[in-house]
């Protein structure tokens, strides 16, 4: 099976003064894919040494008991399984499955079957290789969630720091509701502003972070998310707040891995992108020193 290759468009940048720019930019599905893939179509060989571990999880992991990248990744995924009450034979959907690590781990460890959605052909290819390597029943689709069709249903649908990219979040929750079997579970782990004041205008640091992801970030307050969950046929049963020290340690590990593998990474993506990504991780680390954001896993059930 041949690994796909695709040309990367130039990195999108804000124009004008940063404080005048707003979040929740609206793009066509085609442009949205191009913008996010400016990041996610970078070589996996760039991301994997940075993220580390067996499962290459590109989001905050849990460090209360863990001493290695793999242990921290598995601790977070085990928490997801506990919150979703996963049982053997169930069917789950990962929206924004990246290179397939979390979905493959959950299927392998908990005896479930899974479907993963990604917009990146390279991520799809690697996720499929990983699923085959671990001999799990996983289907990976290069598909926008809006276009995804399914007639079997799922016991659980989850996202891990993915809904920040969904401008039309209410429509996403309605879609999930239609995909879940009766009594099914939706889990969304995401970063939330502690006040609606913070999502009105962007600081230069915010703007830089959004440039990395093609200007597709749309952070909300937890209250805003819960309102949309309620309006689209769910009842929220668990709000699990994650200690921000876990994100600080995750970012520290990623930065340490970047420095350790600098020569290899620069050879892959060039010095400019290496420096920009390192600056991005430093800003992520700085974000979690403040009080403007929380990190929460929201577990809701279809009613």
What are these regions (language model features)?
Residues 192, 198-294, 301-303:
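Substrate-binding/catalytic lobe of Class I Rossmann-like enzymes that use SAM or dcSAM, i.e.
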Residues 99-110:
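Conserved SAM-binding loop of SAM-dependent methyltransferases across substrates and taxa
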Residues 89-96:
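Conserved class I S-adenosyl-L-methionine
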Residues 133-147:
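Conserved SAM-binding strand-loop segment of SAM-dependent methyltransferases
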Residues 147-157:
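A short acidic, Gly/Pro-enriched loop at the edge of an enzyme's catalytic core
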Residues 170-185:
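A short glycine-rich, Lys/Arg-flanked "PGG" loop and its adjoining helix->strand segment in the class I
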Residues 127-128:
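Conserved SAM-binding loop
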Residues 1-48:
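N-terminal auxiliary segments of SAM/dcSAM-dependent transferases
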């Amino acid at each position: 099976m041949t690994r796909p290759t695709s040309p990367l468009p130039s990195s999108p940048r804000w124009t004008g003064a940063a404080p005048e720019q707003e979040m929740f930019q609206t793009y066509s599905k085609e442009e949205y894919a191009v913008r996010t893939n400016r990041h996610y179509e970078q070589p996996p060989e760039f991301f994997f040494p940075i993220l580390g571990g067996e499962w290459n999880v590109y989001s905050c992991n849990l460090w209360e008991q863990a001493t290695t990248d793999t242990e921290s990744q598995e601790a977070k995924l085990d928490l997801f399984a506990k919150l979703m009450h996963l049982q053997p034979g169930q069917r789950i959907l990962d929206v924004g499955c990246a290179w397939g690590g979390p979905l493959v781990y959950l299927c392998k460890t908990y005896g479930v079957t899974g479907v993963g959605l990604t917009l990146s052909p390279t991520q799809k290819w690697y996720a499929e290789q990983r699923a085959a390597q671990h001999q799990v029943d996983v289907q990976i689709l290069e598909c926008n969630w809006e276009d995804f069709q399914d007639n079997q249903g799922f016991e659980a649908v989850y996202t891990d720091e993915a809904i920040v990219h969904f401008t039309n979040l209410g429509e996403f929750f309605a879609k999930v509701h239609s995909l879940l079997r009766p009594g099914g579970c939706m889990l969304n782990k995401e970063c939330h502003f502690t006040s609606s004041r913070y999502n009105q205008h962007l600081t230069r640091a915010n703007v830089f972070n959004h440039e990395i992801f093609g200007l597709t970030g749309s952070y909300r307050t937890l209250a805003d998310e819960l309102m949309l969950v309620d309006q689209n046929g769910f009842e929220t049963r668990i709000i699990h707040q994650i200690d921000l020290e876990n994100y600080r340690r995750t970012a520290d590990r990623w930065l340490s891995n970047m420095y350790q593998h600098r020569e290899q990474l620069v050879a892959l993506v060039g010095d400019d992108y290496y420096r920009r990504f390192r600056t991005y991780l430093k800003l992520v680390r700085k974000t979690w020193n403040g009080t403007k954001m929380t990190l929460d896993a929201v577990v809701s059930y279809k009613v």
